[in-house]
UniProtKB/Swiss-Prot annotation:
This is Nuclear speckle splicing regulatory protein 1. The keyword Coiled coil applies. Transmembrane segments: none annotated. Residues 100-176, 358-401 form a coiled coil. Pfam families: NSRP1_N. Residues 222-239, 271-466 have a biased composition (Basic and acidic residues). It comes from Danio rerio (Zebrafish). Belongs to the NSRP1 family. GO terms for biological process: regulation of alternative mRNA splicing, via spliceosome. Residues 1-43, 111-137, 151-170, 188-494 are annotated as: Disordered. The modification Phosphoserine is found at S33. Residues 207-221 have a biased composition (Low complexity). The lineage of its organism: Eukaryota, Metazoa, Chordata, Craniata, Vertebrata. InterPro entries: Nsrp1, NSRP1_N.
Length: 516
């Protein structure tokens, strides 16, 4: 048994021993000439070429012996191409494949385009009716393309009308009796219509759909609707569905149309036609309404977005406007206060200022601390000499005496001697006279003020207008944060306050009693 050349186990690669190159031995005649070696090489090449040519010739002879037409390419090329096409058809699985859904989609697109054109035409017609006789004198231009379009539209309407009439005539649901249904039975029994086989039904459906896709004529649509009507009627009776050839179907459709034409011409047919048109118009209106609602929703969405953006911008503008109004209002108030201060300062006469100062002095004298101090001085005066008492009574204001209670006055009268009472009575008399003089002078001053105010009122108003214009021009130059109150405004405000207090005190007809 011969051992196989296959090895098993661990095989380690072994380096083959490299063949030692033959050493070039130096030749005595090496450099003489190379003619002999070159002639040998060329002879060797020629021999190899002759050998190859001889071998190819032998192979060609052998092939020709086997098949004489092996080298006739032009004659065989057409057959080779046919074989290639057949193989490709087998691989692809049949002839050219036709699209399944695109024809229906294209048909639906065409219908939608036509509906849109009709809507546009109605809209244009309404606009023309609204215009009335406005452009009646103008010349109307109609192109040939538009005329062609109108012609096609008219043909389309007529075709739809014919289809609707045919459908109304052939539809079992729209017929009063089952005469059309039984006519199919009669035609099938007589032999005018061929009863289709159940097995060939699917194939015929496929062929009819292909034919309809190739040429969507009104007759094919009528056949399809007729077959649908028959299928509805056959569900009640038998499971026989009529599918017949194209010529017989056309003849039958024409015959049925002729038979049912009296019914379509009658009032009942007109009523059905009207109902169908109303349903169609209603569907168009619903579609238009849905589109209008969708557009309205889109518009409202865009409006909401814009309104949100506008509200943000409007809020910023409103806040900025409020700030500007507040600043302008503050500026106006300051200008008004400055004008009033200037007017009051100018209106106040020297007499008013003197009266304000006197009222300030009296108010200081009437403070609680001063009254307490006066009481202490009264007690000290009892212990003092008659001269001091007389001086104190002279210096003392009538208001202090008025402030004393009746008990204190009686006690003082009892304590005093007759000699002491005489100078006191004189002092009281002088004080009363002084008070009367003061009240008279105040009344005179008030009357003088009223008369002077009434006289100078007109002149002051004119001056005030000029001064306010000048002051407003100057105040506009003043900074917003500048100090508005000056020494003059403060003093004028104080003087006015004192004048009011003094007038209030003078107008009182009673004396306020102070409790101990």
């Amino acid at each position: 048994m011969a051992t196989s050349g296959k090895q098993y186990g661990l095989i380690l690669p072994q380096k083959r021993a490299s063949k030692s190159a033959p050493l070039a031995r130096p030749s005595v005649f090496g450099d003489d000439s190379d003619d002999e070696t070159s002639v040998g090489e060329s002879l060797q090449k020629e021999a190899i070429k002759k050998k190859m040519m001889k071998q190819t010739r032998l192979e060609m002879q052998k092939a020709l012996e086997e098949d004489s037409t092996v080298y006739e390419y032009d004659n065989v090329y057409d057959d080779i191409q046919k074989q290639r096409l057949e193989s490709n058809k087998k691989l692809l699985g049949g002839e050219d494949k036709k699209p399944k859904y695109i024809n229906q989609l294209l048909r639906a697109v065409e219908e939608r385009k036509k509906e849109q054109e009709r809507r546009d035409e109605r809209k244009i017609q309404k606009e023309r009716e609204a215009e009335g006789e406005k452009f009646a004198d103008k010349e109307a231009f109609v192109t040939s393309a538009y005329r062609q379009k109108l012609k096609e539209r008219q043909e389309e309407l007529e075709r739809e009308k014919r289809e609707a009439e045919l459908e109304a005539a052939l539809d079992v649901k729209k017929q009063k009796d089952l005469s059309g249904f039984y006519r199919h039975f009669l035609n099938q029994t007589v032999g005018e219509e061929v009863v289709p086989d159940r097995s060939a039904q699917s194939e015929e459906k496929a062929t009819s759909s292909a034919a309809a896709e190739r040429s969507p004529s009104p007759e094919s649509t009528a056949n399809r609707r007729e077959s649908e009507a028959e299928s509805h009627s056959d569900d009640d009776q038998v499971d026989v569905k009529p599918a017949f050839s194209k010529t017989t179907a056309n003849n039958h459709a024409k015959r049925q149309y002729r038979q049912k034409s009296p019914l379509s011409d009658s009032d009942d047919g007109d009523e059905r036609e009207r109902e169908r048109k109303e349903i169609k118009e209603k569907s168009h209106k619903d579609r238009d309404r849905d589109r209008a609602k969708e557009k309205e929703r889109e518009r409202m969405r865009d409006k909401d977005k814009h309104s949100h953006r506008k509200e943000d911008r409007g809020g910023d503008r409103r806040r900025e406007r409020d700030r500007e109004e507040d600043r302008a209002r503050d500026r106006r108030d300051r200008d008004r206060n400055d004008r009033h201060g200037i007017r009051d300062r100018r209106n106040s006469s020297p007499k008013d200022r003197e009266r304000d100062r006197k009222g300030e002095r009296d108010r200081r004298d009437n403070s609680p601390k001063d009254r307490e101090r006066d009481r202490k001085g009264e007690r000290d005066r009892r212990d003092n000499s008659p001269k001091d008492r007389e001086r104190e009574t002279r210096d003392k204001s009538p208001k202090d005496r008025r402030d004393k209670s009746p008990k204190d006055r009686d006690r003082e009268r009892r304590d005093k001697s007759p000699k002491d009472r005489e100078p006191e009575r004189k002092g009281e008399r002088d004080i009363r006279e002084r008070e009367d003089n003061k009240v008279d002078s105040q009344r005179k001053n008030q009357e003088d003020e009223k008369s002077s105010k009434s006289k100078t009122e007109h002149g002051k108003e004119e001056k005030l207008v000029e001064e306010t214009e000048n002051s407003s021009g100057a105040q506009q130059e003043i900074s917003k944060f500048a100090k508005r109150s000056s020494d003059q405004t403060v003093s004028s405000a104080r003087e006015r306050y004192l004048a009011r207090q003094l007038a209030r005190f003078a107008s009182k007809s009673y004396v306020e009693k102070e409790e101990d």
